[in-house]
Amino acid sequence: MDIKEYFARISYGGSYEKPDLETLTEIFQHHIQAVPFENLSIHCGETIELDLAATYDKIVRKKRGGWCMENNHLLSWALKTLGYNVTLLGAKVYIPEHDAYADDIDHLLLKVVLHDKSYIVDGGFGMAYQLWQPMELISGKDQPQTPGIFRFVEENGTWYLEKVKRKQYVPNHSDSAPHNVDKEVCRRVYLFTLQPRDIEEFRARNLHLQTAPDSLFVTKSICSLQTPDGVRALVGWKLTEIKYNYKDNMDLVEIRILADEEMEKTLKEKFNITLDKKFVPINTSRLSLF
Protein backbone atom coordinates (compact mmCIF):
# COMPACT_ATOMS: atom_id res chain seq x y z
CA MET A 1 0.00 0.00 0.00
CA ASP A 2 1.33 3.39 -1.00
CA ILE A 3 0.16 6.76 0.32
CA LYS A 4 1.02 8.46 -2.98
CA GLU A 5 -1.17 5.98 -4.86
CA TYR A 6 -3.99 6.81 -2.43
CA PHE A 7 -3.43 10.53 -3.03
CA ALA A 8 -3.65 9.94 -6.79
CA ARG A 9 -6.94 8.08 -6.26
CA ILE A 10 -8.47 11.04 -4.42
CA SER A 11 -6.77 13.64 -6.68
CA TYR A 12 -4.93 15.21 -3.76
CA GLY A 13 -1.81 17.14 -4.73
CA GLY A 14 -1.37 19.32 -1.67
CA SER A 15 1.13 19.27 1.15
CA TYR A 16 1.19 16.48 3.69
CA GLU A 17 4.36 17.29 5.61
CA LYS A 18 2.52 18.67 8.65
CA PRO A 19 -0.29 16.68 10.26
CA ASP A 20 -2.42 19.76 10.99
CA LEU A 21 -6.14 20.55 10.76
CA GLU A 22 -5.87 22.27 7.38
CA THR A 23 -4.20 19.26 5.77
CA LEU A 24 -6.63 16.87 7.46
CA THR A 25 -9.59 18.85 6.12
CA GLU A 26 -8.25 18.97 2.56
CA ILE A 27 -7.49 15.24 2.44
CA PHE A 28 -10.89 14.47 3.94
CA GLN A 29 -12.73 16.61 1.39
CA HIS A 30 -10.82 15.08 -1.50
CA HIS A 31 -11.71 11.62 -0.20
CA ILE A 32 -15.46 12.19 0.04
CA GLN A 33 -15.60 13.79 -3.42
CA ALA A 34 -13.63 10.96 -5.04
CA VAL A 35 -14.68 7.81 -3.19
CA PRO A 36 -18.39 6.98 -3.27
CA PHE A 37 -20.34 5.60 -0.34
CA GLU A 38 -21.72 2.44 -1.94
CA ASN A 39 -22.85 -1.12 -1.28
CA LEU A 40 -22.91 -2.29 -4.89
CA SER A 41 -20.80 -5.37 -4.11
CA ILE A 42 -23.80 -6.92 -2.37
CA HIS A 43 -25.85 -6.50 -5.53
CA CYS A 44 -23.33 -7.87 -8.00
CA GLY A 45 -22.31 -11.05 -6.23
CA GLU A 46 -19.24 -9.82 -4.35
CA THR A 47 -18.36 -10.03 -0.66
CA ILE A 48 -17.42 -6.91 1.30
CA GLU A 49 -14.24 -7.69 3.20
CA LEU A 50 -12.71 -5.80 6.12
CA ASP A 51 -9.06 -6.66 5.54
CA LEU A 52 -7.23 -3.40 4.87
CA ALA A 53 -5.33 -4.78 1.87
CA ALA A 54 -8.59 -5.88 0.23
CA THR A 55 -10.21 -2.50 0.94
CA TYR A 56 -7.18 -0.68 -0.46
CA ASP A 57 -7.24 -2.78 -3.62
CA LYS A 58 -10.97 -2.22 -4.10
CA ILE A 59 -11.04 1.54 -3.50
CA VAL A 60 -7.60 2.71 -4.64
CA ARG A 61 -6.76 0.32 -7.48
CA LYS A 62 -10.20 -0.70 -8.76
CA LYS A 63 -11.55 2.82 -8.18
CA ARG A 64 -14.63 1.61 -6.35
CA GLY A 65 -16.25 3.05 -3.26
CA GLY A 66 -17.33 1.36 -0.06
CA TRP A 67 -19.42 1.69 3.05
CA CYS A 68 -18.34 3.09 6.42
CA MET A 69 -16.22 0.12 7.47
CA GLU A 70 -14.27 0.35 4.22
CA ASN A 71 -14.06 4.11 3.71
CA ASN A 72 -13.14 5.02 7.27
CA HIS A 73 -10.79 2.05 7.70
CA LEU A 74 -8.86 3.17 4.61
CA LEU A 75 -8.97 6.80 5.75
CA SER A 76 -7.63 5.81 9.18
CA TRP A 77 -4.68 4.06 7.51
CA ALA A 78 -3.92 7.14 5.39
CA LEU A 79 -4.11 9.51 8.34
CA LYS A 80 -2.00 7.27 10.60
CA THR A 81 0.57 7.00 7.82
CA LEU A 82 0.81 10.81 7.83
CA GLY A 83 1.33 10.91 11.60
CA TYR A 84 -2.18 11.69 12.86
CA ASN A 85 -3.44 10.35 16.19
CA VAL A 86 -6.44 8.27 15.05
CA THR A 87 -8.87 6.12 17.05
CA LEU A 88 -11.67 3.97 15.64
CA LEU A 89 -15.09 4.51 17.24
CA GLY A 90 -18.42 2.71 16.84
CA ALA A 91 -21.83 4.33 16.39
CA LYS A 92 -25.50 3.36 16.28
CA VAL A 93 -27.37 4.98 13.40
CA TYR A 94 -30.74 6.67 13.96
CA ILE A 95 -33.71 5.16 12.10
CA PRO A 96 -36.40 7.86 11.61
CA GLU A 97 -39.20 5.43 10.79
CA HIS A 98 -38.64 3.65 14.11
CA ASP A 99 -37.78 6.83 16.02
CA ALA A 100 -34.93 4.85 17.54
CA TYR A 101 -31.24 4.14 17.20
CA ALA A 102 -29.96 0.77 16.00
CA ASP A 103 -29.75 -1.94 18.65
CA ASP A 104 -26.14 -2.73 17.79
CA ILE A 105 -23.14 -0.74 16.64
CA ASP A 106 -23.47 -0.52 12.87
CA HIS A 107 -21.25 2.42 11.90
CA LEU A 108 -17.49 3.01 12.03
CA LEU A 109 -16.13 6.54 12.47
CA LEU A 110 -12.83 8.13 13.47
CA LYS A 111 -11.60 10.36 16.26
CA VAL A 112 -8.51 12.44 15.52
CA VAL A 113 -6.66 14.33 18.26
CA LEU A 114 -4.81 17.50 17.21
CA HIS A 115 -3.15 19.89 19.66
CA ASP A 116 -5.22 18.60 22.59
CA LYS A 117 -8.48 18.98 20.65
CA SER A 118 -10.53 16.01 19.49
CA TYR A 119 -12.27 15.91 16.11
CA ILE A 120 -14.72 13.44 14.60
CA VAL A 121 -13.74 12.49 11.06
CA ASP A 122 -16.37 10.45 9.23
CA GLY A 123 -15.83 9.82 5.53
CA GLY A 124 -18.25 6.93 5.35
CA PHE A 125 -21.81 8.03 6.03
CA GLY A 126 -22.76 9.19 2.56
CA MET A 127 -25.95 10.77 1.28
CA ALA A 128 -27.00 14.17 2.68
CA TYR A 129 -25.77 13.48 6.23
CA GLN A 130 -22.13 13.19 5.19
CA LEU A 131 -19.86 15.60 7.07
CA TRP A 132 -17.76 17.84 4.83
CA GLN A 133 -15.24 18.84 7.49
CA PRO A 134 -13.79 17.34 10.66
CA MET A 135 -16.07 18.27 13.57
CA GLU A 136 -14.65 19.43 16.86
CA LEU A 137 -15.85 17.14 19.62
CA ILE A 138 -17.65 19.69 21.75
CA SER A 139 -21.20 19.47 23.08
CA GLY A 140 -23.93 21.93 22.16
CA LYS A 141 -21.95 23.99 19.65
CA ASP A 142 -23.45 24.61 16.19
CA GLN A 143 -20.86 23.81 13.52
CA PRO A 144 -22.09 25.13 10.15
CA GLN A 145 -20.92 23.26 7.06
CA THR A 146 -22.02 23.37 3.43
CA PRO A 147 -24.57 20.51 3.84
CA GLY A 148 -26.17 22.22 6.88
CA ILE A 149 -25.54 22.86 10.55
CA PHE A 150 -24.16 19.92 12.50
CA ARG A 151 -23.80 19.67 16.25
CA PHE A 152 -22.93 17.18 18.96
CA VAL A 153 -24.89 16.81 22.17
CA GLU A 154 -23.28 14.82 24.98
CA GLU A 155 -25.28 13.12 27.74
CA ASN A 156 -23.67 10.87 30.35
CA GLY A 157 -20.80 9.86 28.11
CA THR A 158 -22.91 9.25 25.00
CA TRP A 159 -22.50 11.64 22.09
CA TYR A 160 -25.35 12.39 19.67
CA LEU A 161 -24.82 13.86 16.19
CA GLU A 162 -27.61 16.05 14.80
CA LYS A 163 -28.03 17.94 11.55
CA VAL A 164 -30.17 21.04 11.08
CA LYS A 165 -31.50 20.85 7.54
CA ARG A 166 -32.52 23.50 5.07
CA LYS A 167 -35.87 23.39 3.34
CA GLN A 168 -35.83 21.58 0.04
CA TYR A 169 -37.06 22.71 -3.36
CA VAL A 170 -38.09 19.67 -5.41
CA PRO A 171 -39.25 20.72 -8.91
CA ASN A 172 -40.63 17.28 -9.84
CA HIS A 173 -42.06 16.55 -6.42
CA SER A 174 -44.45 13.87 -7.71
CA ASP A 175 -41.51 11.51 -8.23
CA SER A 176 -40.43 11.86 -4.63
CA ALA A 177 -42.20 10.94 -1.46
CA PRO A 178 -39.57 10.36 1.20
CA HIS A 179 -41.30 10.96 4.49
CA ASN A 180 -38.94 13.67 5.62
CA VAL A 181 -38.62 15.99 2.61
CA ASP A 182 -39.56 19.50 3.76
CA LYS A 183 -40.85 18.14 7.07
CA GLU A 184 -37.90 17.72 9.39
CA VAL A 185 -35.76 20.64 10.51
CA CYS A 186 -33.42 18.91 12.95
CA ARG A 187 -32.54 15.31 12.22
CA ARG A 188 -30.70 12.92 14.52
CA VAL A 189 -27.96 11.03 12.70
CA TYR A 190 -26.22 8.65 15.12
CA LEU A 191 -24.95 8.18 18.66
CA PHE A 192 -21.54 6.97 19.83
CA THR A 193 -19.22 6.75 22.81
CA LEU A 194 -15.49 7.41 22.95
CA GLN A 195 -14.63 3.78 23.66
CA PRO A 196 -11.78 2.83 21.31
CA ARG A 197 -12.62 0.06 18.85
CA ASP A 198 -10.67 -2.41 16.76
CA ILE A 199 -11.62 -3.29 13.20
CA GLU A 200 -12.08 -6.91 14.32
CA GLU A 201 -15.06 -5.80 16.43
CA PHE A 202 -16.92 -4.90 13.23
CA ARG A 203 -16.53 -8.24 11.44
CA ALA A 204 -19.78 -9.79 12.65
CA ARG A 205 -21.76 -6.64 11.86
CA ASN A 206 -20.08 -6.31 8.47
CA LEU A 207 -21.27 -9.82 7.60
CA HIS A 208 -24.76 -9.29 9.05
CA LEU A 209 -25.40 -6.06 7.14
CA GLN A 210 -24.63 -7.70 3.79
CA THR A 211 -26.51 -10.97 4.38
CA ALA A 212 -29.52 -10.40 6.67
CA PRO A 213 -32.76 -10.33 4.63
CA ASP A 214 -34.03 -7.28 6.55
CA SER A 215 -30.78 -5.30 6.28
CA LEU A 216 -31.16 -1.88 4.68
CA PHE A 217 -28.12 -2.65 2.56
CA VAL A 218 -29.60 -5.91 1.26
CA THR A 219 -32.93 -4.29 0.38
CA LYS A 220 -31.46 -1.13 -1.19
CA SER A 221 -28.65 -0.75 -3.70
CA ILE A 222 -26.91 2.51 -2.82
CA CYS A 223 -24.24 4.66 -4.42
CA SER A 224 -23.69 8.26 -3.30
CA LEU A 225 -20.94 10.79 -3.92
CA GLN A 226 -20.34 14.28 -2.59
CA THR A 227 -19.90 16.95 -5.28
CA PRO A 228 -18.37 20.43 -5.08
CA ASP A 229 -21.82 21.94 -4.41
CA GLY A 230 -23.91 19.06 -3.11
CA VAL A 231 -24.43 15.33 -3.32
CA ARG A 232 -25.73 12.81 -5.83
CA ALA A 233 -27.12 9.39 -5.02
CA LEU A 234 -28.41 6.38 -6.91
CA VAL A 235 -30.75 4.29 -4.74
CA GLY A 236 -32.31 1.45 -6.67
CA TRP A 237 -33.31 3.13 -9.95
CA LYS A 238 -33.79 6.60 -8.41
CA LEU A 239 -31.09 9.17 -9.13
CA THR A 240 -31.21 12.14 -6.75
CA GLU A 241 -28.98 15.20 -7.15
CA ILE A 242 -28.90 17.90 -4.48
CA LYS A 243 -27.37 21.37 -4.71
CA TYR A 244 -26.89 22.81 -1.24
CA ASN A 245 -28.10 26.33 -0.48
CA TYR A 246 -29.32 26.75 -4.07
CA LYS A 247 -31.31 29.88 -3.22
CA ASP A 248 -32.98 31.52 -0.24
CA ASN A 249 -31.47 29.00 2.19
CA MET A 250 -33.06 26.13 0.26
CA ASP A 251 -31.49 23.01 -1.25
CA LEU A 252 -32.40 22.10 -4.83
CA VAL A 253 -33.39 18.44 -5.13
CA GLU A 254 -33.66 16.94 -8.62
CA ILE A 255 -34.94 13.37 -9.00
CA ARG A 256 -35.04 11.06 -11.99
CA ILE A 257 -36.06 7.41 -12.32
CA LEU A 258 -33.62 5.51 -14.53
CA ALA A 259 -34.25 2.65 -16.90
CA ASP A 260 -32.20 -0.53 -16.54
CA GLU A 261 -30.18 0.28 -19.63
CA GLU A 262 -29.10 3.63 -18.12
CA MET A 263 -27.55 2.18 -14.97
CA GLU A 264 -24.10 1.25 -16.25
CA LYS A 265 -23.59 4.60 -18.00
CA THR A 266 -24.86 6.53 -14.96
CA LEU A 267 -22.51 4.72 -12.58
CA LYS A 268 -19.58 5.56 -14.86
CA GLU A 269 -20.47 9.17 -15.64
CA LYS A 270 -21.88 10.25 -12.26
CA PHE A 271 -19.80 8.14 -9.86
CA ASN A 272 -16.77 7.03 -11.91
CA ILE A 273 -17.57 3.40 -11.13
CA THR A 274 -17.18 0.47 -13.51
CA LEU A 275 -18.34 -2.87 -12.12
CA ASP A 276 -16.75 -6.21 -12.99
CA LYS A 277 -19.94 -8.20 -12.49
CA LYS A 278 -23.59 -7.79 -13.40
CA PHE A 279 -25.34 -5.28 -11.14
CA VAL A 280 -28.92 -5.96 -10.05
CA PRO A 281 -30.51 -2.79 -8.58
CA ILE A 282 -33.02 -3.12 -5.76
CA ASN A 283 -35.10 -0.84 -3.55
CA THR A 284 -37.66 -2.79 -1.54
CA SER A 285 -37.12 -1.12 1.85
CA ARG A 286 -39.40 1.68 3.00
CA LEU A 287 -36.64 3.22 5.10
CA SER A 288 -35.61 6.61 3.73
CA LEU A 289 -32.04 7.79 3.26
CA PHE A 290 -32.66 11.54 2.98
Curated annotation (Swiss-Prot):
UniProt keyword Thylakoid, yes or no: no
Class of enzymatic activity (EC top level): transferase
InterPro entries assigned: Arylamine_N-AcTrfase, Arylamine_NAT_domain_sf, Papain-like_cys_pep_sf
UniProt catalytic activity: an arylamine + acetyl-CoA = an N-acetylarylamine + CoA; an N-hydroxyarylamine + acetyl-CoA = an N-acetoxyarylamine + CoA
Pfam families listed in its UniProt record: Acetyltransf_2 (PF00797)
The EC number(s) this enzyme carries: 2.3.1.5, 2.3.1.118
Record keywords, A-Z: Acyltransferase, Transferase
Domain of life: Eukaryota
GO MF annotations in UniProt: arylamine N-acetyltransferase activity; N-hydroxyarylamine O-acetyltransferase activity
Annotated disulfide bonds: none
Active-site residues, record numbering mapped to chain: 68 (acyl-thioester intermediate), 107, 122
Function recorded in the entry: Catalyzes the N- or O-acetylation of various arylamine and heterocyclic amine substrates, and participates in the detoxification of a plethora of hydrazine and arylamine drugs.
Family: Belongs to the arylamine N-acetyltransferase family.
This protein's name: Arylamine N-acetyltransferase, pineal gland isozyme NAT-3
Species of origin: Gallus gallus
Organism phylogeny: Eukaryota, Metazoa, Chordata, Craniata, Vertebrata
